[in-house]
Design a protein with these regions (language model features):
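Residue-level signature of the cytosolic catalytic core of signaling kinases
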Residues: 31, 47, 87-91, 150, ...
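A generic local structural motif
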Residues: 4-7, 61, 95-96, 158, ...
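C-terminal substrate-binding subdomain of Rossmann-fold SDR/epimerase-dehydratase oxidoreductases
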Residues: 81, 100-219
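N-terminal Rossmann-like NAD(P)+-binding domain of SDR-like oxidoreductases, especially those catalyzing
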Residues: 1-82, 102, 112, 124-127, ...
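Short-chain dehydrogenase/reductase
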Residues: 44, 48-57, 88, 92-93, ...
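Short, hinge-like loop/turn segments at secondary-structure boundaries
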Residues: 36-38, 93-94, 189-190
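Gly/Ser/Thr-rich beta-alpha loop segments that engage phosphate groups in nucleotides
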Residues: 5, 30, 86-88, 94, ...
């Protein structure tokens, strides 16, 4: 939140256009599927995951307030799960975790049943969406979902990684952390309309192959 306030203050002073990289986490554990930008979310503001989620929601509020009260030129995007080469192998995200475990032939850890779903977006598609968002006119500020609507369970993701790495890993299940969303999928209709027909070009298997190659070369 402090970072948002500082950069908004700077944008106000120098009359700069500013982009907020918000997140699909603002939707919480959604009861609407897929999630459009008009959905206000199903959130727990005091849960163990809520600090990040609520920080992003508060930042969106600050961006809108600076836009309404000070005329700051803002853009807001809501980024869904993104992966690709140059990820930190130890960043704790599910794609990097699964790939590293598979390359080392370690057990792949899935929390809960593994039937919870996510939508995975390749980094190049995200960058293209961000670039197009910044090129839109001042009459469109967002928020707009930037994500891949392809939806996969954690079990499906784990099996794809095992197959693509020819790994001997087994899948093990651990207790599900509290407040873990059961499903996540973007409605990208608005992005397609406002961002010059933007939609993801790299599907999961192709993106995983590129990411696995990078990790293999940097182990």
């Amino acid at each position: 939140i402090y970072g948002a306030m500082n950069t908004l203050g700077l944008a106000k002073r120098i009359r700069a256009k500013i982009l907020q990289a918000s997140t699909s986490e603002v939707y919480g554990d959604p009861e609407v599927h897929p999630q459009p930008e008009s959905y206000w979310g199903h959130v727990n503001p005091i849960g163990i995951r809520s600090c990040y989620d609520e920080g992003k929601r508060a930042a969106e509020t600050l961006f809108m307030d600076y836009y309404r009260q000070n005329g700051v030129r803002i853009k807001i995007i809501r980024i869904f799960n993104t992966y690709g080469p140059r990820m930190n192998p130890n960043d704790g995200r599910v794609v990097s975790n699964f790939i590293m475990q598979a390359l080392r032939n370690e057990d792949i850890t899935i929390y809960g049943t593994g039937l919870q779903t996510r939508s995975f977006q390749y980094i190049d598609d995200l960058i293209e969406g961000m670039t197009r968002m910044m090129a839109t006119g001042d009459d469109f500020i967002g928020p707009v979902n930037i994500g891949n609507p392809g939806e996969f369970t954690m079990l499906e993701l784990a099996q794809k990684v095992i197959d693509l790495t020819n790994s001997r890993s087994s899948i093990v299940h651990m207790p599900l952390p509290g407040d873990d969303p059961q499903q996540r999928k973007p409605d990208i209709s608005l992005a397609m309309e406002k961002l010059n027909g933007w939609q993801p070009q790299i599907q999961l298997e192709e993106g995983l192959k590129k990411t696995i190659t990078y990790f293999e070369n940097h182990l």
